Amino acid sequence: MLQAGAPTAGSFRTGEVHTGTTIMAVEFDGGVVVGSDSRVSAGAAVVNRVFDKLSPLHQRIYCALSGSAADAQAIADMAAYQLELHGLELEEPPLVLAAANIVKNISYKYREDLLAHLMVAGWDQHEGGQVYGTMGGMLIRQPFAIGGSGSTYIYGYVDAAYKPGMTPEECRRFTTDAITLAMNRDGSSGGVIYLVTITADGVDHRVILGDELPKFYDE
């Protein structure tokens, strides 16, 4: 998230740390792909080039973080704790919808105090792969979702490039291309791309390094 106003001398040292960012999640038959860039900024300074913005909430449920880094991580930690207790009560893995509801409730309860948006995605045995947006305390399931400051540059691309029934590899490519395009345009997005693929078989983590990112015309 970009800070309002032009940077000042003090903002290079004291600006709030933001995961001003590009996050994305895509459903496929049997799972989901979640991706993010890795740049974290404070004011006009980049304070972390390789921060992993994909935070686990449970074994097969992840959230993608954007907004204030501290606020987003606080919500993720609270949600993970509540979800763990929920799973113990059920004596079975919790649903992705339950995780999304927990994140939604926390986000809405502290909407005046916390500046963060978490996207929840994962797999469960009842609904398979699922993606939920929770911005501002809402809850909506989507076949794919994007968020963060970089998302404003790629709405047209993802609307045109998405097609139902994509394979896991096609979803990873779709996510990588979209985040790369956002990183090229958004000064608050950059670094490497983290990808997590979640299925019934488990969780697959991948990192796309800078020299492995796809090349586009503007480069």
From Swiss-Prot:
Detected in the cytoplasmic lobe of elongated spermatids, in residual bodies, and in the acrosomal cap of round spermatids. It catalyses: Cleavage of peptide bonds with very broad specificity. It is found in: Cytoplasm; Nucleus. It comes from the Eukaryota. Keywords: Acetylation, Cytoplasm, Hydrolase, Immunity, Nucleus, Protease, Proteasome, Threonine protease, Zymogen. The keyword Acetylation applies. The 26S proteasome consists of a 20S proteasome core and two 19S regulatory subunits. The 20S proteasome core is composed of 28 subunits that are arranged in four stacked rings, resulting in a barrel-shaped structure. The two end rings are each formed by seven alpha subunits, and the two central rings are each formed by seven beta subunits. The catalytic chamber with the active sites is on the inside of the barrel. Component of the immunoproteasome, where it displaces the equivalent housekeeping subunit PSMB6. Belongs to the peptidase T1B family. This is Proteasome subunit beta type-9.
